[in-house]
Each structure stands twice: as C-alpha cells, then as structure tokens.
C-alpha cells in the first residue's frame, strides 16, 4: 500500500520524504490556508520535493471553472493531480479532463455509488472519507470494503485513496482490505512508529549494555 501525506506543511513533507515513506501528497484549501502562503507557491514547492502525485484542489463549483483551474494547476508540475469534488458538475469536469490526459482525484466520496460514478467518469483516484463517516455514526471502513469489492469485480483501474484518516487503525484496516493508498496526516503517521514494547525493549537493551560495560 502506498502512503500519501495529507498536509501542505513543507517541513513535514521533507521530514517524512527523507525516510522514504512519502509516495505522494494530498492537499486542500484548508490545509494550505494553515500555512499562510500563496496557494500556487506551496503546490509548486511540494511538487519539487515529492516525485509522486500531488493533489491540488479546484475552488470553482461549475465544470467550466473547474476545467479552467485544472489546466492552470497542471502547468505547475508534471506530478500535479487535480482534486475535484463529487458533484454532477465535478463529474462533467473529470470526464473532460480525463480525455485531455489530466489526472484527477475525486474527493468527498461517502458512498460506493459515488466512487463508481467517479471511476466511470474517468477519475484517476477516488478519495472515500472514512473519519467523517465515523463522526456521524457510520462505519467508514465498511465503505472502503464496498468500494474495493465493486472495483475488484469489474477490474476498475481507478485507485482508491483512503482519506480522512484519524488513527493508525484506519491505516491498518486499509492495508488489510487492499486499498491502493492511505493519505495520512503527519501526526497519525508519527503514531505508526510507536509501540510500548519497542520502547521497553530499547530501554532493556541499553540497561543491559550499561551493566555489562560497568562490570
């Protein structure tokens, strides 16, 4: 499974990229707003750091506006993927862009039907939001299992990005279900490193070594 970093924080991207853990990056207007920098400047810098896909989201709500923005975004770098919302206008834009060879990531997916529609429209990626479904009392990971089942049954090549990841269990369950990608906030990715028995083991090794050296 590929790991995308869900952030626009350039320093965090550099940190995890240096570990060989970043296969791509997803951003959205809210994440870029947190950085307090120019939208295009941030996307361009991220694309220069990461070799893999970098998702940048359009702001327009009409298909014509989305297509216009998308064509500008892909001029920034070869690895830009255009993020499009799951709406009728969005799917119209995806269909146009796919015919132009522009890769798209359809975001705000909350049902398998929506994922299927996006794939049929020509999306390169779909992003089901698991954490937000959990927030309203639904099982976010069940959606992933449904999407993987449908895509597998028909050999659909659109890749599934598990989004709105809130904790390490989301990542593990995504991997067990065979999801192509999990896009992970850096604080959640940090938690994947941790286990109390690892810490205890390191402490024991150091203690034993110090005791040995002090004999």
UniProtKB/Swiss-Prot annotation:
Q: Pathway involvement?
A: Carbohydrate degradation; pentose phosphate pathway; D-glyceraldehyde 3-phosphate and beta-D-fructose 6-phosphate from D-ribose 5-phosphate and D-xylulose 5-phosphate (non-oxidative stage): step 2/3
Q: Which domain of life is it from?
A: Archaea
Q: Which UniProt keywords apply?
A: Cytoplasm, Pentose shunt, Schiff base, Transferase
- Give the matching CDD domains: Transaldolase_FSA (cd00956)
Assigned protein family: Belongs to the transaldolase family. Type 3B subfamily.
Matching entries from PANTHER family are given as: FRUCTOSE-6-PHOSPHATE ALDOLASE 1-RELATED, TRANSALDOLASE
- Official protein name in the record: Probable transaldolase
Q: Name the gene for this chain.
A: tal
